[in-house]
Amino acid sequence: MTDGEFRLAYVPGVTPGKWAGVWAERVREVPLRLLQIPATEVVPLLRNGGVDAAFVRLPVDREALHVIPLYLETTVVVVPKDHAVAAAEEVELADLADEDVFEPLDEVLTWDDRPGKPAFTRPESTAGAIELVASGAGVLLLPQSLARLHHRKDLTYRTVTDAPQSQIGLAWLEAVTTDLMEELIGIVRGRTPNSSRGRNPQQQPTRKKPPKQRPASKHRPQKRRRR
């Protein structure tokens, strides 16, 4: 943390707005600064102290880092709207065997056996690969979040059911697990403000219930007879 703010990096495709909103409600005294950082740069930036925590795409080098895996992303294939794949609701890798598949230099998926045929070039970025797909030169496989980020009206995408998936995680330095970091972990994991693992939950003192009072007797006292 620096200058009274908590710096949270995130890789393209991650949408931290919901968590940022919860932070603003719970940690009003410390602003949350969001920084979108390329996937290849985010871990070095974290190690150098440029940010306090980061949403990263796994796997990453975990040396000196704490990493919490959060969720898996659906993998899709991006194609022109008039492509044959667009007629299906979802496809398998075998359906792409005859396709020219782009592999950008900032590829985020890990492949044992890449489908299709290598395209004629390796674009420097996912954005560049999207441009080439729009020209009809090939197709591109990537997480659905990135397909949405690079949305174009002339392109569409379909789920690839048996493709490897990208996983998003929350990372921070092992040596810097602060109260604010614990607060962020709680927010991301959906803990309530008064969770026992929260930063400083305010506990209300237990109030003892007052003793129950017996209802007054309905019988009137009998008058003493005069002798």
Provide a role label for each language-model segment.
Residues T2-L8, P12-Q36, P44:
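Short alpha-helix C-terminal cap/hinge motif
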Residues E5-V11, A54, V78, F102, ...:
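Short, well-ordered beta-strand segments
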Residues G17, E89-R122:
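Secondary-structure junction motif
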Residues K18, R158-K208:
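A late-sequence structural motif
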Residues V22, T40-T75, L155-R158:
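Short beta-strand-centered segments that line the small-molecule binding cleft or hinge
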Residues A24-E25, L35, A39-V51, T126-A137:
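Short helices/loops that flank or line small-molecule/ion binding pockets
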Residues F55-L65, T126-L155:
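A ligand-binding cleft/hinge motif common to bilobed small-molecule-binding domains
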Residues V67-T75, V79-V101:
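Flexible hinge/capping segments at coil-to-helix
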